[in-house]
Each structure stands twice: as structure tokens, then as C-alpha cells.
Amino acid sequence: YTPQVPCACSFQFASRNATLFTRTFSGDQISMRVGPPALKKAIQEFASGNPVMVFDSSFRESETDLLWPAQFATPQVMRRLRNDCGGLLFLAIGNEIGEKFDLPWLQDIHTNHALVQLHPVLDYLKTDDLQYDNKSAFTLSINHRDTFTGITDRDRALTTRRFGELSGEVLQNGLSNQEAQIALGREFRTPGHIPVCRESPGGLSSRQGHTELAVSIARMAGLVPCTIGAEMLQPDGDGALPVEEARAYAERHDIPMLTGDDLLEHYGNNGAVN
């Protein structure tokens, strides 16, 4: 399952069947698409399989996430997310992947009339009081079928990497929704230890959460829209890591750091949000 690490301007990875999913941008194309040097550097690093940090907004969660392209996940990446961030590891996926795999938002499942009638507790537990948004991005959680418990760094890396690779294979080969869902079930089970967050339809035009931001970075880098990440917390765990400390971490480890405004401004200037 080891991916092939690309150069800064191209992306390719080996699938389970040794086929390649490849997308390439010339340096000039990346420059035109990305614009500001800081954003360009971040996208080039991400396209090369390196991490990027994103602070959403002081008007939203006020959180910084450390992000990696899903198909480049290794046990070392998972360990870094676990040790350096402290928050929940999550897999952000593009809405087109969610549609192909028919992954429902948990909020929709929990408000399904038939299920609520069968399990009335779901009505008591409904999400109607989010302070940062109207709807949660969480869908199902998954484990790869070749994992044991699914929680080890090795297990979670396998789950993350193969989901990213499989998503690329599905999109590249034009599988039907049913074929995609069968392929997903062949390799994965639920529940699992990788929570999946699905992009809102319309992307950043409809929701400006970390899910949409993480997916947009992958798209800009020419990668499959699957990104693994975790929220960065204060050492005592009592709150999000202050943005100043997040920037210091980014500088210390030479990781590009962006804000939600950076990405929204880029998409606004280019007349697109996806």
C-alpha cells in the first residue's frame, strides 16, 4: 500500500491493483490557480505529501488543524497527529466521494423518522444546539478489514491510506455508485476508528468548516479530495491551541499555515468555490 511520493507539481499513487491515478499541473498552472506565494507554497507542499496547517476563523471554532493528504498516511503521520495535536483524528472527504459511496450524515440518520420511532432516545439526542454551525459534517466511522482493532497507528494509517486510494480509483475509473459501494464494503467495515466527515454540497459556498477547507486544499493540489487531520489543542487539553502558538509550531517545523480567509479569498477571486 506504499504510495509513490510525487514531485511538487504532480501526484500519483499506486492502488491495490497497481494502477495509477495521476493528475499533473505545471508550475505555471499552479501559480495561476493559487496566487499568493504563501498559498502557492502550501499547495505545493501538500501535493508532495507534506502537511499543511489551517486556522478556520475567530468567528467559528477558532481552531487550527494539522492536515495531510489521506493517500500519504503512514503510521508516523498518525503518530504525529496523535501526539502533536491532541484532538480527534478525522478524515475529510469531498461530497462527490460521499455521494459515490452513499455515506449518510449522522445527523440525517439520527433524525430518520423510522429510526426515531424505533429508538426514541435519538430524538432526545438530536443535534439542534451547535454553537459554530447548523449541521455537523460527521458521517460513518470506518476500519479497513485488514486491521485488528483498528486503533493502532498502523491500523489507522492503513484505513486512511486505502480509503484515499480507493476513492481515487473510483473517481478515475468512473465506477457506478453501486460498484463503488460494493468496492467500499469489500475493504471496509463500520463502525471503526477513523471518523469520516463529508463535505457539504456546494463546498465553501455553503459551509466554511474544517471539512470543506481540508477538502479544498486537496483539490487545489490536484489530489483526491480526502484529507486526514486533527485539531490542535492546548497541552492541558482545556481549549484549542491559540493561533499564535499554532503559528510558532508551524514555523518551528517549517509547515505552511493558512487561514480560512486565505482559501475563501482565493476561491472568491477565481469565481469558484470548488
What are these regions, as identified by a protein language model?
Residues 1, 11-13, 21, 25:
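Aromatic (phenylalanine/tyrosine) cluster motif
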Residues 7-9:
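Cysteine-centered motifs
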Residues 21-274:
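Catalytic domains of riboflavin
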